[in-house]
């Protein structure tokens, strides 16, 4: 067969070409998924477990009959690698691709739809051919706020994850700007990583990892070392960090349902103090974790004795008030309002709860609501000078806000009026022009009539 004949054969029956020349990309090397690269991608990275990938594809049966195409829908197909969202062949084949690559995949039934098929388009025990283009891929957004992106290098064992308070043993390597600043084995309690110079993003990620999992974590400043940076490691304020973490082992902390009321109250006293230490150190996210434990343990606790109920209510009130203060510092004002609402549900005349809710609403530009809360503070404590000053601030801000709105609306109405006037002027000019043309036609018509010769048959 000549080169030209081979190229023609490849175009006419690409599935046969992959069957003859394709690379076996399966771990078992059983030729269940064969691949030929048709266009080389760029870069060195390939998708990892959990990555979200964006592809275009054409799918055909081995006889060349098309059964599906993302091009027909005019939008890429999106799925996550290694999550069982697609056939096995795709998890295997796409994970070998580079961004921009186009490849042909030939997939045996056991790596596709097997004996059941996918009727009516795909019969049982069908070998499938795909042309796949990898448009893009990105890591898993763990908290859905862009702050922690995980890329899993090695899948963990089992289905259990560390919880808050679990004792973990990990290996970590931290990088910033291409420089390794930390590399060690360390044991600590989840939620208390800061005590070991470990950023909060690692604590959060560990709660979603399995034993022996190895992953790469991209941490935004909020989940790294934040505005303070980490002089010990030479980390500047608001730096983005990359950690490679291996969870070697862990022992879960007791879940709420495993603790009796007495133990919950004892633990609440401990974590309240830990939260206060974090708060005073400016570590507000870590403080939120500690105060949040109190809420998770006691908010839905029933059947308490009078003494236990009083202690529980006291811990919950303090937790909600402290959480509100943390969220104010973190500029999460809606959450601060929510915590104040819960605190005031326990004590409707709580001065701190009213004041902090007023602060949060003021920062959300809810001036009237904020003013109402500060006025309630004065009803509780007429000597609260800060609340009195805040009322003045609310009035001033509301006035400024109203004046700004008036200016905006005045400018809008002025523009509308100018536009209407311009349209009216254009209509008038158009009408005048039209009348002029009509008069001209009449004049010409009369002139023609006067020039008509008389006496013709």
UniProtKB/Swiss-Prot annotation:
It is an enzyme of class 5 (isomerase). It comes from Saguinus oedipus. This is Peptidyl-prolyl cis-trans isomerase FKBP5. Its main location: cytoplasm. Acetylation impairs ability to promote interaction between Akt/AKT1 and PHLPP1. Deacetylation by SIRT7 promotes interaction between Akt/AKT1 and PHLPP1, leading to suppress Akt/AKT1 activation. Ubiquitinated, leading to degradation in a proteasome-dependent manner. Deubiquitinated by USP49, leading to stabilization. Residues 1-11, 447-457 have a biased composition (Basic and acidic residues). TPR repeats lie at residues 268-301, 317-350, 351-384. The modification N6-acetyllysine is found at residue 28. Keywords: Acetylation, Chaperone, Cytoplasm, Isomerase, Nucleus, Phosphoprotein, Repeat, Rotamase, TPR repeat, Ubl conjugation. The modification N-acetylmethionine is found at residue 1. GO terms for biological process: chaperone-mediated protein folding. One of its GO terms (cellular component) is nucleus. The modification Phosphoserine is found at residue 445.
């Amino acid at each position: 067969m000549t080169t030209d004949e081979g190229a023609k054969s490849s175009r006419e029956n690409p599935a046969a070409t992959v069957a003859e020349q394709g690379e076996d990309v399966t771990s078992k090397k059983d030729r269940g998924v064969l691949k030929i690269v048709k266009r080389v991608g760029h870069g060195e990275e390939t998708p990892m477990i959990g990555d979200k990938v964006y592809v275009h594809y054409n799918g055909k049966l081995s006889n060349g009959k098309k059964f599906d195409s993302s091009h027909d829908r005019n939008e890429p197909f999106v799925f996550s690698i290694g999550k069982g969202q697609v056939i096995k062949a795709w998890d295997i084949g796409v994970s070998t691709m580079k961004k921009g690559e186009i490849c042909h995949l030939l997939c045996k039934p056991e790596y596709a739809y097997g004996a059941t098929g996918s009727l009516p388009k795909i019969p049982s025990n069908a070998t499938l051919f795909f042309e796949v283009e990898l448009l893009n891929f990105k890591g898993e957004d763990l908290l859905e706020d862009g702050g922690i992106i995980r890329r899993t290098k090695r899948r963990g064992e089992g289905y259990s994850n560390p919880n808050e308070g679990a004792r973990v043993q990990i290996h970590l390597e931290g990088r910033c700007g291409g420089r390794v600043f930390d590399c060690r084995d360390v044991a600590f309690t989840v939620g208390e990583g800061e005590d070991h110079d470990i950023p909060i993003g690692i604590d959060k990620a560990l709660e979603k990892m399995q034993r022996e999992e190895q992953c790469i974590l991209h941490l935004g400043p909020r989940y790294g070392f934040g505005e303070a940076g980490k002089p010990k490691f030479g980390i500047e304020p608001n730096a983005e960090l990359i950690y490679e973490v291996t969870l070697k082992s862990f022992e879960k902390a007791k879940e709420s349902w495993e603790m009796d009321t007495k133990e919950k109250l004892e633990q609440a006293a401990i974590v309240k103090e830990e939260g206060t230490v974090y708060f005073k150190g400016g570590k507000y996210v870590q403080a939120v974790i500690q105060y949040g434990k109190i809420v998770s343990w006691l908010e839905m606790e029933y059947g308490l004795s009078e003494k236990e109920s009083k202690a529980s209510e006291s811990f919950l009130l303090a937790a909600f008030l402290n959480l509100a203060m943390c969220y104010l510092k973190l500029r999460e004002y809606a959450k601060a309002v929510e915590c104040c609402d819960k605190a005031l549900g326990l004590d409707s005349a709580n001065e701190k709860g009213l004041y902090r809710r007023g602060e949060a609403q003021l920062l959300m530009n809810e001036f009237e609501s904020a003013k109402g809360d500060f006025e309630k503070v004065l009803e509780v404590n007429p000597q609260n000078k800060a609340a009195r000053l805040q009322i003045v601030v609310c009035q001033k801000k509301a006035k400024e806000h109203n004046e700004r709105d008036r200016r905006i609306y005045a400018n809008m109405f002025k523009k509308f009026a100018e536009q209407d006037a311009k349209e009216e002027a254009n209509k008038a000019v158009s009408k005048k022009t039209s009348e002029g043309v009509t008069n001209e036609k009449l004049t010409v018509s009369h002139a023609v009539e006067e020039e008509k010769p008389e006496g013709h048959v």
